[in-house]
Regions:
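N-terminal amphipathic/basic-hydrophobic helices that include classical n-h-c signal peptides
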Residues: 1-20
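Core catalytic region of metal-dependent phosphoesterases/phosphodiesterases
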Residues: 14, 22-115
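Acidic, His/Gly-rich catalytic cores of divalent-metal-dependent hydrolytic chemistry
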Residues: 18, 182-235
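Active-site-proximal beta-strand elements of phosphoester/diester hydrolases
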Residues: 22-30, 125-132, 189-192
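Active-site environment of divalent metal-dependent phosphoester hydrolases
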Residues: 30-35, 59-62, 84-89, 134-136, ...
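His/acidic metal-ligating clusters that form di-metal
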Residues: 44-47, 106-181
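Metallo-beta-lactamase
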Residues: 50, 137, 143-148, 191-204
């Protein structure tokens, strides 16, 4: 399967000689409208005109309704995250705090919009998913170790979750931790990090520590195809 997948990589790259494509990838906004606006402004400043969204757009203690309105107006290619699904596949009484404190601020149009997200997408030869191709709530590039700390997976474990996907570049989110991994066959998997919830202080652990990136800065990625080769910049 690996040889067949590698053979197909070139077929999925832009074929025009000298073709240059730039795409911004955002993920895990979690209703943080201020962070979203800051990231959109930075993307515009860099001259990138195409944006894809990797899910988990509204759940969180910020402004879910305004975030939904802005994203709906942008009409970005968007895949479903586990927190998007959690806003419509269970009763409010069974929701976690991520969802229960925002669901009443959402309209039926907002919920219908969330329901419209596919689990995966292919855009310009790129493969998009929230977490892994098969699951919207599984860590791909790492796993949770003691005290919930993230530990990098080895390459065979990363590749095992790829299945038969032959895209040269795969974009994901979910863990809020930016990372880029190149597989032995040349495929690259990029976790964009989180726009809206890049870090939080977890007092459940002993000693307590800051999860995810350890920084309050919003994160996203810009990917570029230059002369048939994809490059990723974690911003």
């Amino acid at each position: 399967m690996r040889k067949a997948r590698a053979k197909n990589l070139r077929n999925l790259l832009p074929s025009e000689t000298g073709h240059h494509m730039r795409i911004a990838a955002i993920s895990d906004i979690h209703g943080n409208i201020a962070a979203l606006r800051a990231v959109l402004s930075d993307i515009d400043r860099r001259g990138v005109t195409k944006i894809v969204n990797l899910g988990d757009v509204l759940s969180g203690p910020f402004d879910a309704g305004a975030t939904a309105d802005l994203l709906m107006s942008l009409d970005l290619p968007t895949v479903r995250g586990n927190h998007d699904r959690a806003l419509y596949d269970q009763a409010k009484a069974k929701m976690d705090l991520w969802e229960s404190w925002v669901v009443d601020a959402l309209t039926s149009d907002h919920i219908d919009w969330l329901r419209s997200f596919p689990p995966t997408l292919e855009v310009d030869g790129l493969f998009l998913c929230h977490a892994t191709p098969e699951k919207d709530d599984e860590n791909w590039l790492d796993f949770r170790g003691p005290d919930d700390r993230l530990i990098a997976r080895d390459l065979p474990a990363v590749e095992a979750r790829l299945g038969d996907i032959s895209a040269p570049l795969i974009l994901c989110g979910h863990t809020h931790t930016p990372r880029s991994v190149r597989l032995p066959n040349g495929q690259r998997i990029v976790n964009t990090g989180a726009v809206g919830c890049p870090a939080y202080f977890d007092t459940r652990c002993d000693p307590a520590f800051v999860h995810q990136t350890g920084s309050p800065d919003a994160r996203y990625a810009i990917v570029e195809c230059i002369d048939g080769h994809w490059h990723a910049d974690l911003v």
